């Protein structure tokens, strides 16, 4: 089953657009685990167990593991999710961006070492920086397009004078991803929840692509505005490409106590329900 089909299955089974990001910070762990990088797997596995029936995907961020020399714990976690939540696709948030043989090795890392179902990439170096990943025909390749950070304006909002119509960089990327780059139907785009107008513009340019939308929760994105911008429906109520709305810190650190997993579930459930309410409104 390819990544797009996995998303559709998880959305249907769990009635969810919510992706829980797994960004472990040992300094925020509860109780006796606080500050202990050796507990990264245990913490993340507890979050997975508490939320796996509420999500469309999980998204571990590789830097939060690598910084603590915990890549082995990430491997364990990926295998654990595959075993205990086999209907939930896993997005490896790596944001790699390189070319040639280096890109080939990064692709092997994501899809062979970690067995991810999809990976995030920076496409700044062009198509040959993503092509090695597209050789894995059943995997998702998710390109940074319009990111939620303020510095995204430095490049993404600049107009391209040499391209007909002088689109902004993020618009040009969305168009390319929807058309000539999407040879096997594997591509998706990252669009930050803090910019609903740009989500709507990306959806206009890339009507069938999945959109991974971070920024709901701790970064201040509004769930209703996010869903209404990204989920466009026709007269029959059928929607365009799926949306994957990520929340990380708001779920992971809902409590600093021993009830952290239960608190994470409560926040995940409330977020899922808010997204579903917005989805229902968008379909009317």
UniProtKB/Swiss-Prot annotation:
The record ties this protein, via InterPro entries, to: Aldolase_TIM (IPR013785), OMPdecase_AS (IPR018089), OMPdecase_type-2 (IPR011995), OMPdeCOase_dom (IPR001754), RibuloseP-bd_barrel (IPR011060)
Q: Which domain of life is it from?
A: Bacteria
EC assignment: 4.1.1.23
Alphabetically list the UniProt keywords.
Decarboxylase, Lyase, Pyrimidine biosynthesis
Known catalysed reaction(s)? orotidine 5'-phosphate + H(+) = UMP + CO2
Q: Where are the catalytic residues?
A: 95 (proton donor)
Q: Does the record's keyword annotation contain Lyase?
A: yes
Report the gene name: pyrF
Q: Is the Repressor keyword given for this protein?
A: no
Query: Which biological pathway?
Result: Pyrimidine metabolism; UMP biosynthesis via de novo pathway; UMP from orotate: step 2/2
Q: What class of enzyme is it?
A: lyase
Q: Biological process GO terms, please? A: 'de novo' pyrimidine nucleobase biosynthetic process; 'de novo' UMP biosynthetic process
* Organism the protein comes from: Leptothrix cholodnii (strain ATCC 51168 / LMG 8142 / SP-6) (Leptothrix discophora (strain SP-6))
Q: Which residues form the signal peptide?
A: none
Question: Know the name of this protein?
Answer: Orotidine 5'-phosphate decarboxylase
């Amino acid at each position: 089953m390819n990544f797009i089909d996995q998303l559709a299955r998880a959305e249907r089974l769990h009635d969810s657009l919510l992706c829980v990001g797994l960004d472990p910070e040992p300094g925020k762990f509860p109780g006796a685990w606080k500050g202990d990088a050796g507990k990264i797997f245990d913490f993340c596995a507890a979050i997975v167990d508490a939320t796996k029936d509420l999500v469309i995907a999980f998204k571990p961020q590789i830097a939060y593991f690598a910084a603590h020399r915990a890549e082995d714990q990430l491997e364990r976690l990926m295998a654990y999710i595959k075993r205990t939540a086999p209907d939930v696709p896993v997005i490896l948030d790596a944001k790699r961006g390189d070319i040639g043989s280096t890109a080939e090795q990064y692709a092997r890392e994501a899809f062979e070492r970690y067995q991810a179902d999809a990976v995030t990439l920076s496409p700044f170096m062009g198509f040959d920086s993503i092509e090695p990943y597209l050789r894995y025909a059943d995997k998702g390749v998710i390109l940074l397009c319009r990111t939620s950070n303020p510095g995204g304006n430095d490049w993404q909002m600049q107009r391209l004078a040499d391209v007909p119509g002088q689109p902004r960089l993020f618009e040009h990327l969305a168009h390319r991803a929807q058309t000539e780059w999407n040879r096997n139907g594997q591509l998706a785009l990252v669009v930050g929840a803090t910019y609903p107008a740009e989500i709507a513009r990306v959806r206009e340019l890339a009507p069938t692509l999945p959109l991974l939308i971070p920024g709901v929760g701790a970064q201040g994105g509004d769930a209703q505005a996010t869903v209404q911008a990204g989920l466009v429906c026709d007269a029959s109520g059928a929607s365009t490409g799926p949306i994957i709305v990520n929340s990380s810190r708001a779920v992971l650190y809902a409590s600093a106590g021993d009830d952290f997993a239960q608190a994470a579930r409560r926040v995940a459930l409330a977020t899922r329900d808010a997204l579903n309410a917005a989805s229902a409104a968008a379909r009317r």
